[in-house]
Amino acid sequence: TTASGGHLWLSVIGFFGVTSFLSMWMSNTSTTAMMLPIAIALVGKEYPRMRAYVVLGTAYAANIGGLATAVGSPPNGIAVSALDIDFFTWFKVGFPSAIMMFPLVILAMWVVIRPEKNAMVNQPGGNNNFSMEWNAHAKGSVALFIFTVFCWIFSSQIGHFLGLKQFDRMIAIFITALAPILGLISWKDLEKKIEWGILILFGGGLCLSVILSETGTSKWLATQMIQTIAGSPDWVVIIASITLMIFLTELASNTGSAAILIPVMMALSNQFNPAITYALVFGVGVAATCAFMLPV
């Protein structure tokens, strides 16, 4: 709110932008949980529609940001694993997708909710501006974050230079171990604050994907689908698959849905038309995070 000069719309759009950016590097669930208290404090109860706009927008902005990178949302990781691509290959498609979706979702919410035009933004902490001590720990954390992003974006080049495969996976483990060694966080805090449930869910999703592929279940399901869509153009297959994933994730876990459908889509594209593999799996992977309609 300080950077926006107290201007309501600049504050709100800026807040959504920060939420999306954080969600590129954190799980969208964690980002939403962290930003919601700030969103609630941003607009008073006397403006209920604007408050609803900001609170819902925070959740949507976190979902949109999660599309941009391979680490932003578990379905992205499942798609990356299935396609055997690196961080930057996903980023080249995911980031533009997130950039295009951001204004569309913000505008659609405004049309539906119609927030009060005279709403005022609250200044957190009253007249006292928020300030953070820019100490060695803060500087070290920012430096480590920039280093991690750099290594992820250029993972292919660095991995080729070092002769290492899947370097983007290795850098994540390396940074996790390096942070407590440098004293930026204690091992106890790391153990307590890591969302182990999400990691287990993600790992379980990858295991389920492998099981479906290795047992031939995904190929059998793909064969049944091909019999239904035989003779359809490629674009019809892609749009139908994306639509199926969007509606499935309205009722089921996006990670679980991605773990089940992505191996099927891989098998489907290999049998139907291998040329559409990347477009189909990218589309389905992105669609898994687009569960905007229902609270579940």
Where are each of the predicted segments found?
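Hydrophobic transmembrane alpha-helices of multi-pass small-molecule transporters
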Residues: 1, 89-223
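Hydrophobic transmembrane alpha-helices that form the pore/transport pathway of multi-pass ion
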Residues: 5-67, 74-83, 254-287
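Transmembrane alpha-helical segments of multi-pass membrane transport proteins and ion-pumping complexes
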Residues: 7, 11, 20, 24-33, ...
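Hydrophobic alpha-helical transmembrane segments
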Residues: 9-17, 31, 55-56, 91-99, ...
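Alpha-helical transmembrane segments of multipass membrane proteins
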Residues: 20-21, 42, 149-153, 177-181, ...
